[in-house]
């Protein structure tokens, strides 16, 4: 118990003690080196680099042992609660190392058989999964959404380990993310599961992510038998029983619960449908008692979320479309990737939004391209994160069509792609 609390204490933000800096160590899949040896070598590396500025990643090493066994060493999440990159003295911090290897297997399907039918009820990943690597960093939000979610889950686990009386202080281990489509709610849930599996790798050997297929669960055929819901959650219970695993249950588009319940009240669905809804809520109530489970849910239609479910959620976080500042960060990350891959060539330095603010948005040879990117970001407001991540590809496909392009040429293409996106939206709206 004390060991578990110690792990969590290391992961939680400190108030009076020295700040904690998290370092993720991606061990190569082919490596069989002991974590203790990797830990020792990485700490030697960090001792040689006492001062860092914000997040930083090493992918090349002087030491042969690290080269053979480690893909990358990353100081991460320093900017979740601090607006600007600031110098960090590692010698004055508590450095928490999180060593992990990625699971390359991909998702498997959880099938439920009933007579002649075979329904895919859920997708199942063993975490940390290669599929989700880098997903956390790709998600950009204006408010401290990511840090709040991390702190929430850490607190739920701490309260469980400390045996806090849940009759006096209640928490349900249920997170609800709601907002318009395309804002990254489902991706954030998957990224959060991955991040927590890595951060708590000293406590749990691996993570399990079960994504329940809401459309199958509440289809007409499926609603005829609540037994299948119980059978599905029994499979989840088997995973939870393994105390070496941290289990995440993801229910996407949870408003399906409401749709089924309201249809029953209106008399348009069989009474079995309401039994299935109640069975799901009952099963959630049962599995949330376990300290190694977190229930993650999303909804595209905020006003249609079932009240019975909303009451169960500890955190109800709205995820809206990105602001111009967030869009700038998204575009900047896309441009950096294209320069790294030499599709945009030659490489040119772009200023961050904070750096533009510091020079008062004055145009000169250094700031000119970044100011153009800022203008494109402003006129992109209203587009979802999903669309924004596609636009660099569309810009190249529609307006570049060459192996390499200068950054000036690409920004011009990106601007045209944004204009085209809004034109297409107007045309679609005219037909509706």
UniProtKB/Swiss-Prot annotation:
PROSITE patterns, per database record: AAA (PS00674)
Gene3D superfamilies linked to this entry: P-loop containing nucleotide triphosphate hydrolases
Residues recorded with modification N-acetylmethionine: 1
Keyword Nucleotide-binding: yes
A molecular function GO annotation: transcription coregulator activity
Entry superkingdom: Eukaryota
Binding positions for ATP per the UniProt entry: 179-186
Effect seen on changing residue 173 to Q: In OZEMA9; uncertain significance
Gene Ontology CC annotations of this record: chromosome; male germ cell nucleus; nucleus
Subunit structure and binding partners: Specifically interacts with the ligand binding domain of the thyroid receptor (TR). This interaction does not require the presence of thyroid hormone for its interaction. Interacts with HPV16 E1. Interacts with proteasome subunit PSMA8; to participate in meiosis progression during spermatogenesis.
Noted disease: Mosaic variegated aneuploidy syndrome 3: A form of mosaic variegated aneuploidy syndrome, a severe disorder characterized by mosaic aneuploidies, predominantly trisomies and monosomies, involving multiple different chromosomes and tissues. Affected individuals typically present with severe intrauterine growth retardation and microcephaly. Eye anomalies, mild dysmorphism, variable developmental delay, and a broad spectrum of additional congenital abnormalities and medical conditions may also occur. Oocyte/zygote/embryo maturation arrest 9: An autosomal recessive infertility disorder due to oocyte meiotic arrest at metaphase I. Abnormal zygotic cleavage has been observed in some patients.
Described function: Plays a key role in chromosome recombination and chromosome structure development during meiosis. Required at early steps in meiotic recombination that leads to non-crossovers pathways. Also needed for efficient completion of homologous synapsis by influencing crossover distribution along the chromosomes affecting both crossovers and non-crossovers pathways. Also required for development of higher-order chromosome structures and is needed for synaptonemal-complex formation. In males, required for efficient synapsis of the sex chromosomes and for sex body formation.
Protein name in UniProt: Pachytene checkpoint protein 2 homolog
Source taxonomy: Eukaryota, Metazoa, Chordata, Craniata, Vertebrata
